[in-house]
């Protein structure tokens, strides 16, 4: 454990040396990261297969491609983002230079998540490097194969002092959080997010928390249900439901509930065949603890599809629950598994009320052909982000910041927003020593009369 302090101190010394200040150095490190990924795609895929049973294609599409896109976008935009930003002048500052200067924060701690253990560890790192910080990486110990891989690869390609990787579980993370960082980025549960924030408060360290919650999916009667259900099924059951922005539950009018069930079932058959257990595209629950938690949420009396599982392989069949009571256990926590409850509401207003009576979610989804329905849902609810007539895809766009609100998190990242998150925007005014006559009015003694505006 004593080694953790020395690793963090070494990262701070490396940062204080000033070598991250030049943009060229940052670009070189991002290019090294890019090279690391491209030269080790097989190893990344193998680690993801070992932990989550992802195949080569889903590993690339769900995790790697987004990181490579982020690196490309960041390298192309960095010189513009880092330029001093002029601001409007007041009457008294017409002769001055006024601008905002972006400077690195210092040493950033990134605590990754187990469900997308490559993407959610490396993508935040991209923005932190671009902003000129040292970055201490703490991959999730739950996805142990990926943690092992990252701790091996990153020192081979990148500056060893600036970008150390620390492996371990709760004891190591607890020790890490005792250290003073200049920013902490955490992705994971709300419960642990509160622990991270409490630890950060002791050092007045700012945090970005990407948490989660129960992301609702409202399906309007005025909707192409074939398309809607295909997109919903894709987003819900990818990675076996272990996605922080997966649609957690469906809200719909009771008159279309059965039709939604049938169309979801058709999509599941199209995606995974008659038996999802045999599909190479269908994942597994990460460990026994999470497996037990998810199956405990399945009420057999409400099962319209699925509801079966295999404990040795941690397989849970894609499951649909109907006529779900809002007070039932499956509606009290983020499911984070392949179980889709359907709750019936009789109007858009009732759906909005239902959503607003609960904690603010990380994402919200609405399917409708009626723009007024979509605009009303957006205007009268709150969530980290919204996708209308699809799911999840808003987080793949680098020009849209990704983050939560309320219980689903704070702060945001992706694209330019990542650069801003990991930078201090420093207000600067540069004035000449000439023209002192114009400043005389501010000096004592005060005039007898107040000036008129």
UniProtKB/Swiss-Prot annotation:
Q: What class of enzyme is it?
A: oxidoreductase
Instruction: Tell me the subunit arrangement.
Output: Homodimer.
Q: Which UniProt keywords apply?
A: Acetylation, Cytoplasm, Lipid metabolism, NAD, NADP, Oxidoreductase
Please give the function described in this protein's UniProt entry. Answer: ALDHs play a major role in the detoxification of alcohol-derived acetaldehyde. They are involved in the metabolism of corticosteroids, biogenic amines, neurotransmitters, and lipid peroxidation. Oxidizes medium and long chain aldehydes into non-toxic fatty acids. Preferentially oxidizes aromatic aldehyde substrates. Comprises about 50 percent of corneal epithelial soluble proteins. May play a role in preventing corneal damage caused by ultraviolet light.
Q: Where along the sequence do coiled-coil regions lie? A: none
Q: Does the keyword RNA-binding apply?
A: no
Give the GO terms filed under biological process for this record.
Answer: aldehyde metabolic process; lipid metabolic process
Identification of the protein by name: Aldehyde dehydrogenase, dimeric NADP-preferring
Q: Mainly localized where?
A: cytoplasm
Q: Which InterPro entries match?
A: Ald_DH/histidinol_DH (IPR016161), Ald_DH_C (IPR016163), Ald_DH_CS_CYS (IPR016160), Ald_DH_CS_GLU (IPR029510), Ald_DH_N (IPR016162), Aldehyde_DH_dom (IPR015590), Aldehyde_DH_NAD(P) (IPR012394)
| Source superkingdom | Eukaryota
Annotated binding of NAD(+), by residue: 188-193
State the EC number(s). 1.2.1.5
> In the UniProt record, does the keyword Cell membrane occur?
no
Q: Where in the cell is it found?
A: Cytoplasm
Q: Which GO terms describe its molecular function?
A: 3-chloroallyl aldehyde dehydrogenase activity; alcohol dehydrogenase (NADP+) activity; aldehyde dehydrogenase (NAD+) activity; benzaldehyde dehydrogenase (NAD+) activity; oxidoreductase activity, acting on the aldehyde or oxo group of donors, NAD or NADP as acceptor
Q: Which Gene Ontology terms of cellular component type are present?
A: cytoplasm; cytosol; endoplasmic reticulum; membrane; plasma membrane
Known catalysed reaction(s)? an aldehyde + NAD(+) + H2O = a carboxylate + NADH + 2 H(+); octanal + NAD(+) + H2O = octanoate + NADH + 2 H(+)
